[in-house]
């Protein structure tokens, strides 16, 4: 992409919607949060329309598609319903994620290698509509090869195992896996993003990795916003990332 920026921040607004849905109120508004995040330095807005609609609702997607000034990164499962919504809404980016993510925390990313035809079909349909497709995968060479073969121009490396590591040694091992995966993905010509579980305390090593394009971060920013305010929480994360990326 070039430009002066060395790394980009995608702010995930799912948990603004979680807070709203807890009481089925009209506030806090994910749309308002997204627009404020943009003014605070977010380079894109990420939202996950789940099949159970537990946080983001269809109306949020529709309104945000019309109002965002940056780009929308719509996370979704690889189902006919979701593909239909994406093709109708036409966000700039779609990130395909595991169907039941909460039950797959140990596995993390999509098994692209195990469902190559399905992934190739989804990538082709979205790509033909002018949507840039990203696949959310583990830091695994076989999955990177499969993502490349499926025709996805972008991958998002799952950083959850790194974030959740119980010891320094385990974290160092996970970090090395991610580092190698980023380098390998770049060698295949893929744009490599990363996300899941990133916080103000663990983001900088990932942001400093050569070849990382964008980090998608949500929960940590929403939590920090309780204490410092939403715009400051977004700006603070962006500052940490840019400082690390040099």
UniProtKB/Swiss-Prot annotation:
InterPro entries hit by this protein: Aldolase_TIM (IPR013785), PyrdxlP_synth_PdxJ (IPR004569), Pyridoxine-5'_phos_synth (IPR036130)
Signal peptide (UniProt feature, chain positions): none
* UniProt keyword Transferase, yes or no: yes
Q: Which CDD domains match?
A: PNPsynthase
EC nos: 2.6.99.2
Q: Name one GO molecular function term.
A: pyridoxine 5'-phosphate synthase activity
Residues the entry annotates as binding 1-deoxy-D-xylulose 5-phosphate: 14-15, 50, 55, 105
Task: Quote the catalytic residue positions.
Answer: 48 (proton acceptor), 75 (proton acceptor), 196 (proton donor)
What is one process in the GO biological process aspect for this record? Answer: pyridoxine biosynthetic process
Question: Part of which pathway?
Answer: Cofactor biosynthesis; pyridoxine 5'-phosphate biosynthesis; pyridoxine 5'-phosphate from D-erythrose 4-phosphate: step 5/5
What does it catalyze? Answer: 3-amino-2-oxopropyl phosphate + 1-deoxy-D-xylulose 5-phosphate = pyridoxine 5'-phosphate + phosphate + 2 H2O + H(+)
User: Which stretches are annotated as coiled coil?
Assistant: none
Cell location: Cytoplasm
Which of UniProt's keywords are assigned here? Answer: Cytoplasm, Pyridoxine biosynthesis, Transferase
Q: Where is this site: Transition state stabilizer?
A: 156
Q: Out of the domains of life, which is the source?
A: Bacteria
What GO cellular component is one of the record's annotations?
A: cytosol
For binding 3-amino-2-oxopropyl phosphate, which residues are annotated in this chain's numbering? 12, 23, 197, 218-219
Q: What is this protein's function per UniProt? A: Catalyzes the complicated ring closure reaction between the two acyclic compounds 1-deoxy-D-xylulose-5-phosphate (DXP) and 3-amino-2-oxopropyl phosphate (1-amino-acetone-3-phosphate or AAP) to form pyridoxine 5'-phosphate (PNP) and inorganic phosphate.
Q: Whom does it interact with, and what assembly results?
A: Homooctamer; tetramer of dimers.
Give the family this protein belongs to, as stated in its UniProt record: Belongs to the PNP synthase family.
> What's the protein name?
Pyridoxine 5'-phosphate synthase
Which organism does this record belong to?
Thiobacillus denitrificans (strain ATCC 25259 / T1)
């Amino acid at each position: 992409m070039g430009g002066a920026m060395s790394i980009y921040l995608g702010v995930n607004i799912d948990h603004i919607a979680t807070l709203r849905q807890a009481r089925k109120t009209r506030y806090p508004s994910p749309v308002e949060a997204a627009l404020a995040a943009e003014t605070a330095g977010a380079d894109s807005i990420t939202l996950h329309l789940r099949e159970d609609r537990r946080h983001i609702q269809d109306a949020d997607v529709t309104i945000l598609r019309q109002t965002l000034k940056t780009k929308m990164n719509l996370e979704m499962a690889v189902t006919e319903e979701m593909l239909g919504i994406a093709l109708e809404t036409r966000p700039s980016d779609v990130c395909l994620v595991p169907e039941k993510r909460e039950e797959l925390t140990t596995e993390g990313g999509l098994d692209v290698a195990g469902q190559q035809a399905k992934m190739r079909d989804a990538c082709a349909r979205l790509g033909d509509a002018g949507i840039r497709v990203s696949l959310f995968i583990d830091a695994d060479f076989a999955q990177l090869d499969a993502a490349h073969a499926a025709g996805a121009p972008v991958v998002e490396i799952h950083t959850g195992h790194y974030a959740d590591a119980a010891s320094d040694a385990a974290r160092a091992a996970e970090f090395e896996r991610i580092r190698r995966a980023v380098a390998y993905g770049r060698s295949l010509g893929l744009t490599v993003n990363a996300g899941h579980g990133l916080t103000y305390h663990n983001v900088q090593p990932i942001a400093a990795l050569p070849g990382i394009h964008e980090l998608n971060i949500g929960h940590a920013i929403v939590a920090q916003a309780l204490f410092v305010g939403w715009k400051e929480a977004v700006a603070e994360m962006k500052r940490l990332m840019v400082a690390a990326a040099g």
